[in-house]
Amino acid sequence: MLKVAALYQFAPLPDFREVREPLRALCVGLSVKGTILLAGEGINGTVAGMPDAIDALAAELQTGTLFSGRLDNLELKFSQASVMPFARLKVRLKKEIVTLGDPATDPTRAVGIYVEPKDWNGLIAAPDTLLIDTRNAFEVAMGTFEGAVDPQLARFGEFKDFVAQKLDPDRHRRIAMFCTGGIRCEKASSYLLSRGFKEVYHLKGGILKYLEGIPESESCWRGECFVFDDRIALGHGLTESRRAGRLMDGAPGDD
């Protein structure tokens, strides 16, 4: 059984271009495959390999010399795959590790309030909480939280238009957001704060961490969670979906 790691952290990485090749060499040496994005604002990726290899990569990212402790708050979600879900390794340089397209939004400076999965149900059950799914529309169609607003995004960059057209800081006093692994909703929370919203929450570790830790009997999640690899979707306990392969024919990009 292979180990899959979804990882990200917003952190200033002014030398992100210089660490690309050493990071690629490390992954090649560990026979790890997947995609890692590097930008001045941090790191984002999903990789797979033998359990010892993934553990070694995670340890190097968090405490090794390559990043010198700058990724000590790396958000990690682990799951399993019966076969390698990636065809190759890609380490890419980007302007943003998740593309919003607003240069003024800086998650390394300010983000909303993290909510642990165990506290999520209580927050979204409150009548004055507006719950927003920050993923693309095709992902929402496969599964989402009960009562969540679907902004009908074709790509994450359209979130800005949704905010301008549908949200108002004076009317929407408490907003809770979620996404697959936490990165999109974290950046969305930073954007909302920059637009004058005061009480902004986001699910720490995203849907994957929630599905990993919350029993299905207590869950407010309905459906399955799309993932951007050959497994297509995961269910409670991060088990591979048996249904999703019949629903999706290939995986689109992760914008």
From Swiss-Prot:
Its EC number is 1.14.-.-. GO terms for biological process: tRNA modification. SMART domains: RHOD (SM00450). The keyword tRNA processing applies. Pfam families: Rhodanese, UPF0176_N. SUPFAM superfamilies: Rhodanese/Cell cycle control phosphatase. Keywords: Oxidoreductase, tRNA processing. The active site is at C179 (cysteine persulfide intermediate). It comes from the Bacteria. Residues 125-219 form the Rhodanese domain. It catalyses: uridine(34) in tRNA + AH2 + O2 = 5-hydroxyuridine(34) in tRNA + A + H2O. It is an enzyme of class 1 (oxidoreductase). InterPro entries: Rhodanese-like_dom, Rhodanese-like_dom_sf, TrhO, TRHO_N. One of its GO terms (molecular function) is oxidoreductase activity, acting on paired donors, with incorporation or reduction of molecular oxygen. Belongs to the TrhO family. Catalyzes oxygen-dependent 5-hydroxyuridine (ho5U) modification at position 34 in tRNAs. NCBIfam families: PRK00142.1-4. This is tRNA uridine(34) hydroxylase. It comes from Nitrobacter hamburgensis (strain DSM 10229 / NCIMB 13809 / X14).
